[in-house]
A protein has these predicted regions:
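Glycine-centered tight beta-turn/hairpin loop motif at sheet-sheet or coil-to-beta transitions
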Residues: 45-47, 116-118
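Glycine/charge-rich catalytic "coupling/switch" loops of P-loop NTPases
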Residues: 1-24, 29, 49, 56-103, ...
């Protein structure tokens, strides 16, 4: 927990969400289109970049500018996972990693994936989509920019 980050401290001790995937990052770019805007986020690992789509009103309300610290939220059902990276090329965001755990239910599976920086990504997939996944498998998680939620202190 970085002591210099008020956002990190508050979210760690008081913010609770149902989003299984939560990462700290910094805004590196934002366009100013009149309706839907695109925001580039550099995660705290210093290498992973995400594309986020938000409304112009959200961008204004959150005062998103370059250098602003944010908390990135992504619900597990919004993440797809594939063994073939070419399947993910149409998505705005792709993250490579290794499957570390699979909890197989009757209809859904929870898949945990280790990212290169050691953080965990969680996806819930229909059982049929997880049938060819096993622990130790190298995979690509992918999702579109409009699935990502940004939280920040204003």
């Amino acid at each position: 927990l970085p002591l210099y980050s008020l956002l990190a401290a508050i979210s760690r001790f008081s913010l609770q969400t149902s989003a299984r995937n939560q990462w700290f990052g910094t805004v590196t770019a934002r366009d100013h289109d009149p309706v839907q805007q695109h925001v580039a986020i550099l995660l705290a690992d210093g290498t992973t970049r995400l594309k986020v789509a938000i409304t112009a009103q959200s961008g204004k309300r959150l005062a998103l500018e370059e250098g602003k610290e944010v908390l990135v939220l992504l619900k597990a059902p919004w993440v797809n996972i594939t063994r073939d990276p070419t399947d993910a090329l149409q998505a705005d965001n792709q993250l490579q990693g290794v499957v570390t755990h699979i909890d197989r239910g009757d209809e859904q599976c929870e898949v945990l994936m280790a990212l290169p920086d050691g953080q965990t990504l969680c996806a819930t997939l229909p059982h049929a989509q997880a049938v060819n996944l096993e622990e130790g498998t190298e995979v690509t998680a992918y999702f579109n920019a409009d699935r990502v939620i940004i939280a920040t202190l204003c």
